[in-house]
């Protein structure tokens, strides 16, 4: 079973990985000079993927904060 500290570190690592993916996707969007040539379907999929990753990052951040609060309460 993971300790709170291990779970916290795992969440932060996963959050950083998601942040990296968000940055890569954002850069891809910026680098595509002919974004207007993408189909509406492709634009919608990219938008959904980007929003899903941002939401997941927020969830990971909240879970990490919960663990930090729980750990600090139990260490007193």
Regions found by a protein language model. Give the residues of each.
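Extended, charge-rich alpha-helical interface modules
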Residues: 1-76
């Amino acid at each position: 079973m993971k300790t709170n500290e291990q779970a916290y570190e795992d969440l932060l690592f996963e959050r950083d990985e998601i942040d990296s993916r968000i940055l890569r996707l954002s850069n891809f969007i910026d680098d595509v000079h002919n974004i207007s040539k993408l189909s509406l379907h492709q634009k919608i999929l990219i938008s959904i993927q980007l929003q899903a990753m941002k939401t997941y990052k927020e969830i990971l951040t909240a879970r990490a904060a919960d663990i930090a609060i729980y750990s600090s309460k139990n260490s007193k």
